């Protein structure tokens, strides 16, 4: 039996930990928000924070990550490119290269061997269907995969601006946390408002996932 490369093993562990954090944070945020809403109610501040950040990141994912970076459905200058790259990254669905490479690979092998999030069951019967459903929705995020960027996104690798945005992925996530927190904190002039903005504008919203795009 061949031992796994320690570097690859550590990288896989970090990726799985990040995947759990990405999946668990909105789930926990939703529970906390619902409990607080039940006991304290919600106002226009919370609704505004949720709607604003959802629309911003959904635009970044739907138009940016999907139509622009993955499919080149239109052309854009550096300002628009940066806007879509940053807005899409704030959704915390992965850096530009990861998102586009995964989506292009999905289209190249749709529901076949090589599709990173195919729902086709590996086993027959009810259990196999459940496993396929789980893998298509969340399980694929925890699978250790060799990076395929040079095969599926060579055009993005040659773009200096896109590479700079991609390399600062975690900075954009932090920016997505700070924007609604600062805005709500300044509006209310209170730490409570800032925390409310953090919860409703960051930890609650979820944007459409790459697996949902079929075109």
Identify the role of each PLM range.
Residues 205-215:
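Single conserved hydrophobic/aromatic residue that forms the stacking wall/gate
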Residues 1-204:
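Non-catalytic, topology-defining segments of multipass membrane proteins
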